[in-house]
Amino acid sequence: MGIKNLKSLLLENKSLTILDDNLYKVYNGIFVDTMSIYIAVANCVRNLEELTTVFIKYVNGWVKKGGHVTLFIDRGSIKIKQDVRDKRRKYSKLTKDRKMLELEKCTSEIQNVTGFMEEEIKAEMQLKIDKLTFQIYLSDSDNIKISLNEILTHFNNNENVTLFYCDERDAEFVMCLEAKTHFSTTGEWPLIISTDQDTMLFASADNHPKMIKNLTQLFKYVPSAEDNYLAKLTALVNGCDFFPGLYGASITPNNLNKIQLFSDFTIDNIVTSLAIKNYYRKTNSTVDVRNIVTFINDYANLDDVYSYIPPCQCTVQEFIFSALDEKWNEFKSSYLESVPLPCQLMYALEPRKEIDVSEVKTLSSYIDFENTKSDIDVIKSISSIFGYSNENCNTIVFGIYKDNLLLSINSSFYFNDSLLITNTKSDNIINIGY
């Protein structure tokens, strides 16, 4: 649930570490994302009676460790989550249909079991049938709500358990907001219990240490500004509850070491992080990049985004080139595109030294509007006359690639309005910098 891969990425980045749950006995309050834990428990049991028993046992165990447990419970409809709900219903129906077929198969097969260890085999198959039957029952969201509400009545008179209903807001969102309030009065976060990886995003909003738990593991999380950036970048690329992500891209532990991380979640930094491979513009579609980045920023910072119109999904190429269009268009306004490359270069370069008369004559000799082919030696000569170098540049201003003049950002990649080339795959590019 939530942001794909975020937990494994934070583990890879060493800010999230796994602890021995048995070594930590007491907490200053425990906050629970109820629905995520309820579903996790439900997937491990065979019937409602067992679910009730196990869930109550978990809560009572948390009371012993935290003194007081607050169960955050989703209630009401969240308007901006309609697309997410529609996708979940579609996925749930497919899962239900698959499990119904599996149930029919098991029900048929159990009738034909005979011979050696018949009773044991039938008993094992019956357990599977019971579990499938219960999972099919829970595939109906109304049944989930009814059964959860029934279980929660067991805590109505329990002074050690508070039921905190989150009207038209996600429970994990409200839970982390309340956890920040808890921190402001006690000086530490409560233990956070959730299986939803959006919780990790919200927990990245400040650099205070946090203890986060799911059903089987306990984590310590000490986020840095870089982790906050990574969490937001992962929400943007891989998607979160309200934004489906950048189609065609994914951040995983396998490619994390190739991605540049920053402290500030700005458009330039984001594009630099994404520039781990070459991209080519496939369509002329543009997207409102600022709106997308603002939404992710506000959501991650626990600002109230529930009145926003969530941004639509776009491809990673659409995001990147829309983000770069402003810089390219600004450059293009003073760029002679229709002349040969040496002339383009002379017009584009800002002199970094005095150019003497003999050098002006040399530059004049390079002006040939009939010659559309570029000579590498001419390019290097022009660069040198203007005070630039082609080797060992600390700051890259332009790159020349197949008669294309490309801009450079952070010396990390080159681009124009139709292609982006990462600096790690730039063997065929002539650098112009200083």
Curated annotation (Swiss-Prot):
**Induction and repression of expression:** Expressed in the early phase of the viral replicative cycle.
Q: How is the cofactor bound?
A: Binds 2 magnesium ions per subunit. They probably participate in the reaction catalyzed by the enzyme.
Q: What happens when the gene is disrupted?
A: When G5 is deleted, most of the DNA made in infected cells is not packaged in virus particles.
The enzyme's first-digit EC class, named in words, is hydrolase
Question: What keyword terms does UniProt attach to this protein?
Answer: DNA damage, DNA repair, Early protein, Hydrolase, Magnesium, Metal-binding, Nuclease, Virion
- Give the subcellular location: Virion
Q: Which GO terms describe its biological process?
A: DNA repair
Return the GO cellular component terms, semicolon-separated. Answer: virion component
Record GO terms (molecular function): metal ion binding; nuclease activity
- UniProt key word Plastid: no
Residues that, per the record, bind Mg(2+) 2: 196, 198
Q: What is its EC number?
A: 3.1.-.-
* Annotated CDD domains: PIN_Pox_G5 (cd18674)
Which of this chain's residues are annotated to bind Mg(2+) 1? Answer: 33, 74, 168, 170
Which cofactors does this gene product need? Mg(2+)
Q: Give the family this protein belongs to, as stated in its UniProt record.
A: Belongs to the XPG/RAD2 endonuclease family. FEN1 subfamily.
Q: What does this protein do?
A: Putative nuclease that seems to be required for double-strand break repair, homologous recombination, and production of full-length viral genomic DNA.
**Annotated protein name in UniProt:** Putative nuclease OPG089
Q: Which organism is it from?
A: Vaccinia virus (strain Western Reserve) (VACV)
Q: What gene name does this entry carry?
A: OPG089
